[in-house]
């Protein structure tokens, strides 16, 4: 008598169930990882402007003339995750796209005539996605940011 070889239907269903459970756990974690990577790209876009604004403010005695494309501040740029950017009086505004769609980040420098730039205040705004807002606040965290 020949023996049949192979898996039973129940064994296959158990394996499919295990794969489904692992996928349900793994996919959201991977999506959060991708969002943090996108936020890091947005941060990398901001950092040169931060330095340029600080130098402009020190050289010109304030933030009033620190606009994008003038006084040593580069013209605003876009990247894969940044759809729009502006620099006006030292305030750097970034708008997200793709996995950061709907996110806006506003970085505002603090100025003191005696001490110069005293720090940066971040403002991460997105409607109905508190996880992305928290991730934004974590990534755009400086020792002196509020």
UniProtKB/Swiss-Prot annotation:
Pro-region residues? 1-6
Question: Where are its TM segments located?
Answer: 7-27
Keyword Mitochondrion in the entry? The reply is no
- How is this protein positioned relative to the membrane? Single-pass membrane protein
Instruction: Name the predominant localization.
Output: other
Q: Which GO terms describe its biological process?
A: type IV pilus-dependent motility
Superkingdom of the source species: Bacteria
Query: Coiled coil located at which positions?
Result: none
Q: Name one GO cellular component term.
A: membrane
Alphabetized, the UniProt keywords read:
Fimbrium, Membrane, Methylation, Transmembrane, Transmembrane helix
On this chain, the residues bearing N-methylphenylalanine are 7
Q: Which family does it belong to?
A: Belongs to the N-Me-Phe pilin family.
The record ties this protein, via PANTHER family, to: GENERAL SECRETION PATHWAY PROTEIN G, PREPILIN PEPTIDASE-DEPENDENT PROTEIN D
Q: So what does this one do? A: Major component of the type IV pilus (T4P) that plays a role in cell adhesion and motility. Not produced when grown under standard laboratory conditions.
| UniProt-recorded name of the protein | Prepilin peptidase-dependent protein D
């Amino acid at each position: 008598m020949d023996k049949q070889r192979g898996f039973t239907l129940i064994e296959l269903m158990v394996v499919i169930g295990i794969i489904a459970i692992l996928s349900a756990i793994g996919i959201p974690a991977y999506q959060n990882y991708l969002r943090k990577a996108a936020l890091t790209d947005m941060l990398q876009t901001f950092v040169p402007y931060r330095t340029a604004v600080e130098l402009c403010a020190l050289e010109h005695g304030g933030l009033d003339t620190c606009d994008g494309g003038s006084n040593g501040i580069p013209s605003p740029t876009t990247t894969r995750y940044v759809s729009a950017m502006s620099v006006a009086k030292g305030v750097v505004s970034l708008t997200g796209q793709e996995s950061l769609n709907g996110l806006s980040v506003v970085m505002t420098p603090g100025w003191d005539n005696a001490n110069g730039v005293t720090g940066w205040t971040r403002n991460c705004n997105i409607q109905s996605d508190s996880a992305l807002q928290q991730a934004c606040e974590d990534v755009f965290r400086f020792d002196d940011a509020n």
